[in-house]
């Protein structure tokens, strides 16, 4: 399933801008992650650091009041500098189902690709996270690139006994 142009138009009507996060956005991003009820919630401190240190590879969508209503965080892999790793994507509940996550992901990867060579995108998704699976599968389809999946971290590697495996989604290569 891919996001239709109508979904992107509707998503754009839901926010005023997509831009890099600022440190002041850290608390709102933490709340959106917490309220998603699917993401592994990091400490509020880590979201502040993310906004400071990884703003160039992250993005927020802002609502009418300028506050974040969705975010995507990422980083460039140190050992593969042409690979963007998407760490987390979340949309505030009131704005879900309108193509906003897809618009954010497209905007972020376009911005990163404008600054450096981008050959692939990676993320990990647990098998029960169907929304993220749809998001990244449709992203690969929209950009007409391959999507490979393999278990990166088995569930037993995590200290919590209930953690599902993290499946690596490798998307690309993109035309350079």
Curated annotation (Swiss-Prot):
Query: What keywords are assigned to this protein?
Result: Acyltransferase, Transferase
Keyword field contains Transport: no
Species: Streptomyces anulatus (Streptomyces chrysomallus)
Q: What family name appears in the similarity comment?
A: Belongs to the acetyltransferase family. EctA subfamily.
Q: Which NCBIfam families match?
A: ectoine_EctA (TIGR02406)
List the protein's name.
Answer: L-2,4-diaminobutyric acid acetyltransferase
* Record-linked Pfam families: Acetyltransf_1
Which EC numbers does the record give? 2.3.1.178
Tell me the ranges covered by the N-acetyltransferase domain, including all copies.
16-171
Q: Which SUPFAM superfamilies match?
A: Acyl-CoA N-acyltransferases (Nat) (SSF55729)
Listed Gene3D superfamilies:
3.40.630.30
The UniProt entry, under PROSITE patterns, shows: GNAT
For this protein, the parts annotated as crossing the membrane are none
Give a GO molecular function annotation for the protein.
diaminobutyrate acetyltransferase activity
Q: Which GO terms describe its biological process?
A: ectoine biosynthetic process
Main EC class of this protein?
transferase
- InterPro entries attached here? Acyl_CoA_acyltransferase (IPR016181), Ectoine_EctA (IPR012772), GNAT_dom (IPR000182)
Could you tell me which pathway this protein works in?
Answer: Amine and polyamine biosynthesis; ectoine biosynthesis; L-ectoine from L-aspartate 4-semialdehyde: step 2/3
